[in-house]
Every structure is written in structure tokens, then in C-alpha cells.
């Protein structure tokens, strides 16, 4: 089955796993998903992830979710730029999420990074998702 929005699918799987208090979630692997997971791990929203072989030459990511005092560290995670409606932002138009408590993840010419890093490096790009 073809998937029209692989990143949106991963975010939905994470959201569903959090609502069911799961410790891990499995999602198909891709380079973009790996970069987004790297940012989430670096910012402390997930414990980590492992690439596992699912057979037939395909790989999956096993994502270990992070909880603090029996509640998820991720309160909301939402897709912004979608396949039917791409959202691009310049450096000046990157807004803070929850007054700086959350992050936006952007795909820029310099790689996938947070809104803080994009402002520091003075680059804009596609606004992939917001996490709080």
C-alpha cells in the first residue's frame, strides 16, 4: 500500500501510542523520519530509537517513548506542512511554540533542525511539525 504522508503517519503512530501509554512504537524507516527522530531525541522528547530489520530488505524504527511521572513528555505533536498544502517559512517568520517551551521542526537546505537552530543559522525552510 502506498502512503501519501509517511511523516504524518509516524507522528500519528506516536500520538496513538502515547494515548494508550505504550512504551514503544514501531514505524517504517526512512531518512526523513530518522532525521526527525534525531531532533526529538536531542531535544529530550523520546528516549531513543533503533533500526530493526523487518525482512524483505525493509527496515523499521522501534521508537522508545519518554514518560515523566506517568505522563508523556510529548503533550501535543502535530503535522504542519502536508502533501496537499506545503508550509514554508523564512527566518523572520519562524514563530515560537508555546512561548519557547515547545519546538518546531523544519527541513532546511542545511538539514532537519529545530526552530531555535534555524534562527541561529539564519535559514528558513519547510515547517514539518510542532512538538510541545
Swiss-Prot record:
GO molecular function: rRNA binding; structural constituent of ribosome
Gene3D superfamilies with a match to the protein in the record: 3.30.1370.30, 3.30.1490.10
Keywords, sorted A to Z: Ribonucleoprotein, Ribosomal protein, RNA-binding, rRNA-binding
Gene Ontology terms: cellular component: ribonucleoprotein complex; ribosome
UniProt record, GO biological process: translation
Role played: One of the primary rRNA binding proteins, it binds directly to 16S rRNA central domain where it helps coordinate assembly of the platform of the 30S subunit.
Protein name as it appears in the record: Small ribosomal subunit protein uS8
UniProt similarity note: Belongs to the universal ribosomal protein uS8 family.
A matching Pfam family: Ribosomal_S8
PROSITE patterns: RIBOSOMAL_S8
Record text on subunit structure and interactions: Part of the 30S ribosomal subunit. Contacts proteins S5 and S12.
Amino acid at each position: 500500500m502506498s502512503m501519501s504522508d509517511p511523516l504524518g503517519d509516524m507522528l500519528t503512530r506516536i500520538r496513538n501510542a502515547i494515548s494508550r501509554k505504550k512504551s514503544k512504537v514501531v514505524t517504517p524507516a526512512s531518512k526523513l523520519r530518522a532525521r526527525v527522530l534525531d531532533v526529538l531525541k536531542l531535544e529530550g522528547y523520546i528516549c531513543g530509537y533503533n533500526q530493526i530489520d523487518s525482512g524483505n530488505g525493509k527496515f523499521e524504527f522501534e521508537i522508545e517513548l519518554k514518560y515523566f511521572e506517568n505522563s508523556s513528555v510529548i503533550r501535543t505533536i502535530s503535522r504542519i506542512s502536508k502533501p496537499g498544502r506545503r508550509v514554508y517559512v523564512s527566518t523572520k517568520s519562524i514563530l515560537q511554540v508555546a512561548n519557547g517551551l515547545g519546538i518546531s521542526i523544519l527541513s532546511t537546505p542545511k538539514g532537519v533542525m529545530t526552530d531555535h537552530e534555524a534562527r541561529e543559522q539564519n535559514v528558513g525552510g519547510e515547517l514539518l511539525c510542532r512538538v510541545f
